[in-house]
UniProtKB/Swiss-Prot annotation:
Swiss-Prot/TrEMBL keywords: ATP-binding, Glycoprotein, Membrane, Nucleotide-binding, Phosphoprotein, Repeat, Transmembrane, Transmembrane helix, Transport
A Pfam family: ABC_tran
Molecular-function annotations in GO: ABC-type transporter activity; ATP binding; ATP hydrolysis activity; auxin efflux transmembrane transporter activity; auxin influx transmembrane transporter activity
GO cellular component: cytosol; plant-type vacuole; plasma membrane
Residues engaged in binding ATP 2: G1087, E1088, S1089, G1090, S1091, G1092, K1093, S1094
Species name: Arabidopsis thaliana (Mouse-ear cress)
Compartmental location: Membrane
Stretches that traverse the bilayer: 77-97, 128-148, 205-225, 227-247, 307-327, 336-356, 731-751, 774-794, 865-885, 952-972, 986-1006
Membrane topology value: Multi-pass membrane protein
Protein name: ABC transporter B family member 21
ABC transmembrane type-1 domain location: 80-368, 730-1017
Lyase listed as a keyword: no
Positions of region (Disordered): 1-59, 640-672
Length: 1296
């Protein structure tokens, strides 16, 4: 093996003069690089500081409030105007009531000795009823108007955000965002924005109009007393403002730390097979919990500051009262005010200023909404440099398809310091086929990305038909270019819809025709739902070959002038490859075709082959021309491929390898890849999700069955039990809440005593008012202590609960068996939404709701006791009214519960659409599918939108009726009181004592019913979370029970295995499969695509359990072994390795649960031939690999993945197509690494390249779910008409 050339160093040749040339060149290069490096280092540092600064800013930046409504249409504006009118009217209800109230007091106070009090009161009572009717209408308008317009605008913001995200250039996704963040913003942040522009605005307007109304009335009744009371207003305003500022700062900080946790969820769930295989559950959990801690801190701090602010507000209010009572007494004596007038002024100022106090939840909602809107609106405003929605630019009748890259300099935006092309030029004449070959990372795929205009070169130009690509209308030119890439990205919808992405409004006929051309119609017709079969998230329900043919059909439907094939067949087995290649050959006719490949067989027939090396074209010509120069780069590539194989399969091998090479580099650039990678994350095995059958995906009807859509009701105690550790906090908080609750009724007693004092003789009036004033001040001090205590204790408990629920739920998710993630409702998008939004809502069920409930109970009890002591007859009469008020609150709660449930689930579906599209942004861009995605998204949002509107109307009715009932019961109580006074059953001060004690209790109740939307949302959220927490994982990696063998030999046996994937119970994968693998030997599984090869690997790792039969390791059934230990004995290397967005070091250490020593990491990297290229990177082992590893080439990723598998020193090695995606040189290096690590380990290889399989100790041929042949290569090849022999034939014919 002397000839192994380290792939990263380039093709070095032994001829002396070449070597000299290289050394001198390399010297020059080194100097260039030095200069570049110092510049780039400076830039890096600058970039870092800028980035930190940006992050700091982001924490606190907000949008001006009026900007939240930037996206309203005319109907919204009408709704908001109506809502505003309603809110103003509703807000004036209370100030007007104070006038009626003063009348009542004067009637009672001035007629203490006459007997016709009830007639005079009857007149006033009637006015109360009219006022009730007015507020009913106003409240209805207010709530419905604002709720509906808020729902509509939030929907529009979601769509606009998605739309702008979809039109961004690819660089934006490489550098600035990732799928987790986008979905998080769409599901979490829009809720906050909607909150800030919906009913909360109505409420704020209502409160402001109460404030203004109150003061206008007070000044008209008596300006002097009002002025004295107003002197305290600045204090109120200042404490209120300080409060709002602190809250908004904290809210945005909490969001930032939670967004980081969301990324952990997306990465883990998206790559669950890798996590399971490397028993990385603990690591993911601790990573997640780290981010939760900072979110918890921010939450508690927010609670504490709110409490202090509100406490301050309260003491100011009570001192104002004290002042008013004392000074009001003076006014009666000196200025001849009546008692009623003084009370109108006190009440009017009081309701006015209290209304400001109640505005704090609105303020905090506005602040949170403004902070959330900042990032979203920034994104919506961002103008991409390459804008898919830009309609300017040239549109020709058609293009010929001449492509020219002229003197192009390019580096990826995510890695500006690495120059990919320096002065690269290439021209391709129309109708010809050009193949690009070269090592992994040489820039082949970059050419494809530039032709698609995913990126623009930094200098130089890309021209089509002689016109600079930038001059064309982007959408139009992309519609002329068809891309088929190595890992095709399919969307979570039906096969038909996936193909239809190729062409707007394609007919079923056209789609059928495209499937026939792509050789896909056969397998599609076999599926129970045919074209309507769902493909699963990222197409996981189909095998690799099937997905690729659908992708080809999609490209055919588009009928492009220019066809870009990026490793289109490298990931397929011989049979599928031949079929797909045939389909491609048919459609390549008369089109300009650019093929990136590393299997030379694919490129042989190209009109021109260009060999790219380190971003330059080193040779070009046809296959035969290039072979004439035996020292040329192309000849070397071929020789490399042939070195290790016998000619018979060399070509095919070559073919692959080159292809794959190409692929990899493409990948580098490509998020698409990264995207598509995602799919493979799901499908860690060569075939997606290990589901490689030729059969169909989950039939729709099954999905319905599998999701119990009706989530069980969760009892309040169940959630409360989770808060157990905080019981001391909750008890202290509850004590504070009880005290807080009693303050209002006591306040009622004070008022009635003051009323009585106002009608006493002058001397007594003077001393009484002074006494009560002091009592008011004491009450204020009490409130100042009790209020902050309540909020602090409850927010500690609440934030701990949210943290605990998120953590528990995530822990549970990570422990689910892999099959659970195959279900659509458990996709990474849906789980992310559950963890972020639902966990936060549950808090409303315990902490906050509990505080409110305890406080209300205390108010009610205190109120009742006071009332019954004062006058039991009147107390009964007033009490009879209270159930009406209570009933109204209850009806309102019920309505709210019915609605919020379905809306939540429907938005989850919509967020899945977004997740898919952003995850597959390259595919969306190349098929100009932005509008299509938007249509799908909007369609999914229609249902929740209608629900939201219904909710608005019903809430409005409930809200309005409650006011009407309230005012009518006032009228009734006063009239009843007047009759009792007439009859001498009670005195006038007792009437007021009963009245105030009970109304203050009622105020407490109505405040709690305002919580209802939150509590109903919370119980639905709790149900969705407990559905996860309660589900027992069928195969639980955290289960410590089970045997652990002291010494593993590595004998594996599968006996009579039958198996179906849980997500597709009607497709039998294995029927009675038997296979035994001896310790230390290598067994290769071969068979057609979809025969079940990768399924064997999934079963050996216990991702799934067989339906019947057993699998044993060293004679022990694996179900009886401890799962975590079992998985630590197996090392998996799959075709598309999933790397996490961490450093290379962290990715390798992941194999050992993150605690590998530096020496272990380096030696694993050396064994896997990765140490060389890693040391060559600027940051070495500390290089970040990017989301899904996009910053490394295919060969590099694969070697890191092998190092990761080796670091755990497994007894059993599972290689699932480990080298199929690599070019010749990388493959050689990787294969060499694999040969080293396979020694003394039991190895199971799934492969379709013969060279990889030939030397296996046993080859097993899988067909129709059983093993049909097994033996050594030499034996099997000689079976006449044997399955293996015919597969080999296929291979050879495919490769010639």
């Amino acid at each position: 093996m002397d000839s192994v050339i380290e792939s990263e160093e380039g093709l070095k040749v032994d001829s002396p003069n070449r070597a000299d040339a290289e050394t001198s060149n390399s010297k020059i290069h080194e100097e260039d690089e030095k200069e570049l490096k110092t510049e780039s280092d400076l830039k890096e540092e600058k970039k870092k500081t800028e980035k930190n600064k940006q992050e700091e800013d982001e924490k606190t930046k907000t949008v001006p409030f009026h900007k939240l409504f930037a996206f309203a249409d005319s109907f919204d504006i009408i709704l908001m105007i109506l809502g505003t009118i309603g809110a103003v009217g509703n807000g004036l209800g209370f100030p007007i009531m104070t006038i009626l109230f003063g009348d009542v007091i004067d009637v009672f106070g001035q007629n203490q000795n006459s007997s016709d009090v009830s007639d005079k009161i009857a007149k006033v009572a009637l006015k109360f009823v009219y006022l009730g009717l007015g507020t009913l209408v106003a409240a209805l308008l207010q709530v419905s108007g604002w709720m509906i317009s808020g729902e509509r605008q939030a929907g529009r913001i979601r769509s606009l955000y998605l739309q702008t995200i979809l039109r961004q250039d690819i660089a934006f996704f490489d550098v600035e965002t990732n799928t987790g963040e986008v979905v998080g913003r769409m599901s979490g942040d829009t809720v906050l924005i909607q909150d800030a522009m919906g009913e909360k605005v109505g409420k704020a307007i209502q409160l402001v109009s109460t404030f203004i109304g109150g003061f206008v009335i007070a000044f008209t009744e008596g300006w002097l007393l009002t002025l004295v009371m107003v002197s305290s207003i600045p204090l109120l305003v200042m404490s209120g403002a300080a409060l709002a500022i602190v809250i908004s700062k904290m809210a945005s900080r909490g969001q930032t730390s939670y967004a980081k946790a969301a990324v952990v969820v997306e990465q883990t769930v998206g790559s669950i097979r890798t996590v399971a295989s490397f028993t990385g559950e603990k690591q993911a959990i601790s990573n997640y919990n780290k981010h939760l801690v900072s979110a918890y801190r921010a939450g508690v701090f927010e609670g504490a500051s709110t409490g202090l602010g509100l406490g301050t507000l309260n003491i100011v209010i009570f001192c104002t009262y004290a002042l008013a009572v004392w000074y009001g007494g003076k006014m009666i004596l000196e200025k001849g005010y009546t008692g009623g007038q003084v009370l109108i002024i006190i009440f009017a100022v009081l309701t006015g200023s209290m209304s400001l106090g109640q505005a704090s939840p609105c303020l905090s909602a506005f602040a949170a909404g403004q902070a959330a809107a900042y990032k979203m609106f920034e994104a919506i405003k961002r103008k991409p440099e390459i804008d898919a929605s830009d309609t300017t630019g040239k549109v020709l009748d058609d293009i010929r398809g001449d492509i020219e890259l002229n003197n192009v300099n390019f580096s990826y935006p995510a890695r500006p310091e690495e120059q990919i092309f320096r002065g690269f030029s290439l021209s391709i004449s129309s109708g010809s086929t050009v193949a690009l070959v070269g090592q992994s990372g040489s820039g082949k795929s970059t050419v494809v990305s530039l032709i698609e205009r995913f990126y623009d070169p930094q200098s130089g130009e890309v021209r089509i038909d002689g016109i600079n690509l930038k001059e064309f209308q982007l959408k139009w030119i992309r519609s002329k270019i068809g891309l088929v890439s190595q890992e095709p990205v399919l969307f979570t919808s039906s096969i038909k819809e996936n193909i239809a992405y190729g062409k707007e409004n394609a007919t079923v006929e056209e789609i059928r025709k495209a499937t026939e051309l792509a050789n896909a119609s056969k397998f599609i017709d076999k599926l129970p739902q045919g074209l309507d079969t769902m493909v699963g998230e990222h197409g996981t329900q189909l095998s690799g070959g099937q997905k690729q043919r659908i992708a080809v059909a999609r490209a055919i439907l588009k009928d492009p002038r220019i066809l870009l094939l990026d490793e289109a067949t490298s990931a397929l087995d011989a049979e599928s490859e031949r079929i797909v290649q045939e389909a491609l050959d048919r459609i390549m006719v008369n089109r300009t075709t650019v093929v990136v490949a590393h299997r030379l067989s694919t490129v042989r027939n190209a009109d021109m082959i260009a060999v790219i090396h380190q971003g330059k074209i080193v040779e070009k010509g046809s296959h035969s021309e290039l072979l004439r120069d035996p020292e040329g780069a192309y000849s070397q590539l071929i020789r490399l491929q042939e070195d290790t194989k016998q000619t018979e399969d060399s070509t095919d091998e070559q073919k692959l390898s080159m292809e794959s090479m190409k692929r990899s580099s493409l990948r580098k650039s490509s998020l698409s890849r990264s995207l598509s990678k995602r799919s493979s994350s799901f499908s860690m095995f060569g075939f997606p999700a290990g589901i490689d059958t030729n059969n169909e995906a989950i039939p729709e009807k099954d999905i319905k069955v599998s999701t119990p859509i009706k989530e069980k009701k969760v009892s309040f105690f169940r959630v409360a039990a989770l808060n157990k550790p905080e019981i001391p906090m909750l008890i202290l908080g509850s004590i504070a809440a009880v005290l807080n609750g009693v303050i209002l009724p006591i306040f009622g007693i004070l008022i009635s005593s003051v009323i009585k004092a106002f009608f006493k003789p002058p001397e007594q009036l003077k001393s009484d008012t002074r006494f009560w004033a002091i009592i008011f001040m004491l009450l204020g001090v009490a409130s100042m202590v009790v209020f902050p205590a309540q909020t602090i204790f409850f927010s500690i408990a609440g934030c701990k609960l949210v943290q605990r629920i998120r953590s528990m739920c995530f822990e549970k998710v990570v422990r689910m068996e892999v099959g659970w993630f195959d279900e659509t409702e458990n996709s990474s998008g849906a789980i992310g939404a559950r963890l972020s939004a639902d966990a936060a809502t549950v808090r409303g069920l315990v902490g906050d709701a509990l505080a409110q409930t305890v406080q209300n109970l205390a108010s009610v009890t205190a109120g009742l006791v006071i009332a019954f002591v004062a006058s039991w007859q009147l107390a009964f009469i007033v009490l009879a009214m209270l159930p009406l008020i209570g009933l109204n609150g209850y009806i309102y709660m019920k309505f709210m519960v019915g609605f919020s449930a379905d809306a939540k689930r429907m938005y989850e579906e919509a967020s899945q659409v977004a997740n898919d599209a952003v995850g597959s942004i390259r595919t969306v861009a190349s098929f100009c599918a932005e509008e299509k995605v938007m249509k799908m998204y909007k369609k999914k949002c229609e249902g929740p939108m209608r629900t939201g509107i219904r909710q608005g109307i019903v809430s409005g009715i409930g809200f309005g009726v409650s006011f009407f009932v309230l005012f009518s019961s006032y009228a009734a109580s006063f009239y009843a009181g007047a009759r009792l006074v007439d009859d001498g059953k009670t005195t006038f001060d007792s009437v007021f004592r009963v009245f105030f004690a009970l109304t203050m209790a009622a105020v407490a109740i109505s405040q709690s019913s305002s919580l209802s939307p939150d509590s109903s949302k919370a119980s639905n959220a709790a149900a969705s979370i407990f559905a996860v927490i309660d589900r027992e994982s069928k195969i639980d990696p955290s289960d410590e029970s089970g045997r652990v063998l002291d010494n593993v030999k590595g004998d594996i046996e599968l006996r009579h295995i039958s198996f179906k994937y849980p997500s597709r119970p009607d497709v039998q994968i294995f029927q009675d499969l038997c296979l035994s693998i001896r310790a230390g030997k290598t067994i290769a599984l071969v068979g057609e695509s979809g025969s079940g090869k990768s399924t064997v690997i999934a079963l050996l790792q216990r991702f799934y359990d067989p339906d019947s039969g057993q699998i044993t390791l060293d004679g022990v059934e694996i179900k009886t072994l401890q799962l975590k230990w079992l998985r630590q004995q197996t090392g998996l290397v799959s075709q598309e390795p999933v790397l996490f967005n961490e450093t290379i070091r962290a990715n390798i250490a992941y194999g050992k649960g993150g605690d590998a020593t530096e020496t272990e990491i380096v030696s694993a990297a050396e064994l896997s031939n990765a140490h060389g290229f890693i040391s060559g990177l600027q940051q070495g082992y500390d290089t970040m690999v990017g989301e899904r590893g996009v910053q490394l080439s295919g060969g590099q990723k694969q070697r890191v993945a092998i190092a990761r598998a080796i670091v755990k020193d497994p007894k059993v090695l599972l290689l699932d197509e480990a080298t199929s995606a690599l070019d010749a040189e990388s493959e050689r290096v990787v294969q060499d690494a694999l040969d080293r690590v396979m020694v003394n380990r039991t190895t199971v290889v799934v492969a379709h390249r013969l060279s990889t399989i030939k030397n296996a100790d046993v080859i097993a041929v899988v067909k129709n779910g059983v093993i049909v042949e097994k033996g050594k290569h030499e034996t099997l090849i000689n079976i006449k008409d044997g399955v293996y022999a015919s597969l080999v034939q296929l291979h050879l014919s495919a490769s010639t």
